């Protein structure tokens, strides 16, 4: 109840005494910030370094609330034993304020250096986008995506080609390129990627084909996201503890291990559909490469299990 939300779940994550445990890495949020705040992460780290140096030497001007707010929470998160990348989300506005203030007061030489850095980063983003589309999809993006990318990259690199206007290059040109890349990622890449999250795919399949949510049983170590899609708390049974009564005359979603368990119980079933599954939050190069992807995905099955025969066998003890 209240204690769990205000104490166990929060302080327990920091001390690693709660229900959710982790190992903790002191530098986890350092390298997470490097990619999560990209392409302004280099300017962000420079701004933090410069502000820290000014405060130590007591030469700081302007407000310091953003700086100390960021540093305090960043250190708390870094010392926590349980860490997730999205913990940084509330810190990004503070880091953006610090970074912008530093760039506005920076010398021309500094701005010139960062404008070059951002142009290089944008070039890498462009190459990365092309590589991602080629290896993962190998199809043309949607027409609206193509228009957005062409417009964003053209405007961005046009600004980069202009002499001077270093601050506009760092802020606006970079933003145009990044918005274009993010449009592609959310319009084309993520929708295709989510087809490999079998738990959500089976839920959409059930809704489309009018399969009752209360008739599905998830067998195996599955952290089902289907509950949200189906608006129903689904039943999850472990492979080692599943019994005939759990799956008799039910729809079952399971892995090859769960299928083998049903075979050992003597259950009869028909496979309705096979899904390809992969932990989509932990991407690998072999999975992204469509030529090696088949070896990385695991099949998951939606099956209709026949009613089990619970009759006790009659033993003929008649002596002849």
Model-identified regions with their sequence ranges:
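Membrane-embedded architecture of ER/inner-membrane glycosylation machinery
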Residues: 50-320
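Membrane-lumen/periplasm interface segments of specific transmembrane helices
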Residues: 1-4, 79
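Terminal, non-globular segments
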Residues: 45-49
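Membrane-interface anchor segments at the N-terminal boundary of transmembrane helices
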Residues: 21-42, 85, 137-143
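Residue-level signature of the transmembrane alpha-helical core
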Residues: 10, 33-34, 71
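Juxtamembrane membrane-water interface segments that cap and precede transmembrane helices
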Residues: 6-29
């Amino acid at each position: 109840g209240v204690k769990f939300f205000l104490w166990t779940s929060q302080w327990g994550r920091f001390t690693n005494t709660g229900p959710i445990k982790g190992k903790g890495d002191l530098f986890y949020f350092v390298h997470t910030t490097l990619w999560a705040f990209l392409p302004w992460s280099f300017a962000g780290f420079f701004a933090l370094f410069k502000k820290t140096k000014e405060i130590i030497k007591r030469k700081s001007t302007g407000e310091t609330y953003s700086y100390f707010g960021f540093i305090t929470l960043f250190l708390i998160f870094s010392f926590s034993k349980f860490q997730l990348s999205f913990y940084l989300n509330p810190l990004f506005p503070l880091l953006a304020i610090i970074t912008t203030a530093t760039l506005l007061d920076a010398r021309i030489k500094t701005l010139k250096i960062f404008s070059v850095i951002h142009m290089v980063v944008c070039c890498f983003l462009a190459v990365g986008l092309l590589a991602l589309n080629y290896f993962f999809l190998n199809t043309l993006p949607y027409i609206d995506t193509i228009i957005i990318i062409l417009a964003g990259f053209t405007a961005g690199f046009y600004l980069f080609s202009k002499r001077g206007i270093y601050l506009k290059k760092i802020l606006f040109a970079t933003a145009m390129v990044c918005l274009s890349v993010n449009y592609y990622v959310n319009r084309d890449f993520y929708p295709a990627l989510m087809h490999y999250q079998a738990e959500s795919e089976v839920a959409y399949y059930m809704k489309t084909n009018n399969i009752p949510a209360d008739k599905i049983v998830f067998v195996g170590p599955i952290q089902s996201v289907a509950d949200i899609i189906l608006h129903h708390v689904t039943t999850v049974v472990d492979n080692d503890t599943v019994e005939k009564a759990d799956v008799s005359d039910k729809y079952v979603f399971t892995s090859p291990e769960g299928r083998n368990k049903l075979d050992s119980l003597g259950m009869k079933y028909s496979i309705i559909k096979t899904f390809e599954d992969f932990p989509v939050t932990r991407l690998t190069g072999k999975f992204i490469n469509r030529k090696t992807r088949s070896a990385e995905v695991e099949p998951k099955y939606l099956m209709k299990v026949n009613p089990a025969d619970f009759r006790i066998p009659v033993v003929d003890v008649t002596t002849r």
